[in-house]
Amino acid sequence: MAALRMGKLTTMPTGLIYASISVHVAKEEESKKQLVKPEQLPIYTAPPLQSKYVEEQPGHLQMGFASIRTTTSRYIGWCKGVYVFVKNGIMDTVQFGKDAYVYLKNPPRDFLPKIGVITVSGLAGFISARKGSRFKRIAYPLGLATLGATVCYPVQSVIIAKVAGKKAYATSQQMYEAVKSLWTKNNKKLPEHKEKTKLGSADETETPAETTHNLKHSVPLPAELSSETKTKSTSGATQFMPDPKLMDHGQSHPEDIDMYSTRS
């Protein structure tokens, strides 16, 4: 028993000493890791991480709602346009009715005679085109009624004619531009290489015809003229003297030409 007690007493202090030494060593290692010299600090900052934004892909439900919205937006816009058109038409007709009621409630003195002239002219046109075609039945009454209206209301008819003429001119210009654009597009679609081949073939066909024509009408030169031309050409070749400044004399000088031998 005494031996066991002595063993325990001897082992306990050694264990405590070893634990204290290990703890002290660990603390020293941590302090060494944390401490950094100024020379060891980094000069540049760490580069940022390369991040890329990725958009979230729409799901099936979102795609379904988007397709429904795109398909219904067309019909909604069409219905809205029809509603606005009908609303404006109703408002205009109501306003026209109110103005006509106010005007007819207190009409001017020459209103009834003018209306009578217009109605009589329309009836005259209807009666005159009674036995004619359908076009005459429509055109004659309208034409005579408009003629009576222009006679009774000249200022208003002139204004209406000017406005109608401007609108007709604008529409005719638009139609002309549309037809012109279509015509230019159709002309541009024609292949250009066909035109080039046609031109090349025409030139090829024209050149041999011209050469054959010239050969047929060519006349041979007399012998004297041919000999004269030959002598002229040879004499011109012999009489040609090159410029001494441009000649390569080597180490000699052109002034000392008399001192050189001409033996071959």
UniProtKB/Swiss-Prot annotation:
Q: Where is the composition biased (Basic and acidic residues)?
A: 189-198, 245-256
Show the transit peptide stretch: 1-27
- Indicate whether Transmembrane appears among the record's keywords: yes
Which InterPro entries did the record assign? Answer: MIC26/MIC27, MIC26/MIC27_animal
Signal peptide as annotated in the record: none
Q: Which residues lie on this side of the membrane: Mitochondrial intermembrane?
A: 28-110, 156-264
Map out region (Disordered) in residue numbers: 189-264
GO biological process: what's one of them?
cristae formation
Instruction: Using the UniProt record, give the first listed, main subcellular location.
Output: mitochondrion
Give the UniProt subcellular location, in the record's own words.
Mitochondrion inner membrane; Mitochondrion
Composition-biased stretches (Low complexity): 223-238
Membrane topology recorded in Swiss-Prot or TrEMBL: Multi-pass membrane protein
Q: Which residues cross the membrane?
A: 111-129, 138-155
* Residues on Mitochondrial matrix side: 130-137
Q: What does this protein do?
A: Component of the MICOS complex, a large protein complex of the mitochondrial inner membrane that plays crucial roles in the maintenance of crista junctions, inner membrane architecture, and formation of contact sites to the outer membrane. Specifically binds to cardiolipin (in vitro) but not to the precursor lipid phosphatidylglycerol. Plays a crucial role in crista junction formation and mitochondrial function.
How is the quaternary structure described? Answer: Component of the mitochondrial contact site and cristae organizing system (MICOS) complex, composed of at least MICOS10/MIC10, CHCHD3/MIC19, CHCHD6/MIC25, APOOL/MIC27, IMMT/MIC60, APOO/MIC23/MIC26 and QIL1/MIC13. This complex was also known under the names MINOS or MitOS complex. The MICOS complex associates with mitochondrial outer membrane proteins SAMM50, MTX1 and MTX2 (together described as components of the mitochondrial outer membrane sorting assembly machinery (SAM) complex) and DNAJC11, mitochondrial inner membrane protein TMEM11 and with HSPA9.
| Recorded family membership | Belongs to the apolipoprotein O/MICOS complex subunit Mic27 family.
The name this protein goes by in its record: MICOS complex subunit MIC27
Origin organism is Bos taurus (Bovine)
Q: Which gene encodes it?
A: APOL
